[in-house]
Amino acid sequence: MSWQAYVDDHLMCDIEGQHLTAAAIIGHDGSVWAQSATFPQFKPEEVAAIIKDFDEPGSLAPTGLHLGGTKYMVIQGEPGAVIRGKKGAGGITVKKTGQALIFGIYDEPLTPGQCNIIVERLGDYLLEQGQ
């Protein structure tokens, strides 16, 4: 299965008539493996800061998580494995795998819990596959 198929079929999937606003799979080096058409244009330093927070949990808390110029308030995640952010009625979930970061961005009516399930389920599967 191509990386784009993982984004299209697993991340941008229909959940009770709703779906993520945007999604992507990005390598630890900041290279885009696959993304939805709606995923924001991001800066390399934004991905570098996210990677740093996985290595040093809590480093994003004072400044927030920035992606494509949007600032998300960092909320409880799983240190070294999952970062969650909130902005207004939406937010972001980032799951780290061995080689990549899985991004899911959502807005109401999709819930934070639904976004977490979508992103973390694919991330866990990729971890099991050695990715």
From Swiss-Prot:
Could you describe the subunit structure of this protein? Occurs in many kinds of cells as a complex with monomeric actin in a 1:1 ratio.
PANTHER family, per database record: PROFILIN, PROFILIN-3
Output the PROSITE patterns linked to this UniProt entry. Answer: PROFILIN (PS00414)
UniProt name for this protein:
Profilin-4
**Post-translational modification remark:** Phosphorylated by MAP kinases.
Q: Name one GO cellular component term.
A: cytoskeleton
Which cysteine pairs make disulfide bonds? 13-115
Record localization: Cytoplasm, Cytoskeleton
GO MF annotations, alphabetized: actin monomer binding
Q: Give residue numbers for sequence motif Involved in PIP2 interaction.
A: 81-97
Residues with the Phosphothreonine modification: 111
Q: List, alphabetically, the Pfam families matched.
A: Profilin
Where would you say this protein principally sits, based on its record? cytoplasm
| Family according to the record | Belongs to the profilin family.
Q: Which domain of life is it from?
A: Eukaryota
Q: InterPro entries per the record?
A: PFN, PFN_euk, PFN_sf, Profilin_CS
Recite the UniProt keywords alphabetically: Actin-binding, Allergen, Cytoplasm, Cytoskeleton, Disulfide bond, Phosphoprotein
Protein task: Binds to actin and affects the structure of the cytoskeleton. At high concentrations, profilin prevents the polymerization of actin, whereas it enhances it at low concentrations.
Give the free-text miscellaneous remark of the entry: The variability of the residues taking part of IgE-binding epitopes might be responsible of the difference in cross-reactivity among olive pollen cultivars, and between distantly related pollen species, leading to a variable range of allergy reactions among atopic patients.
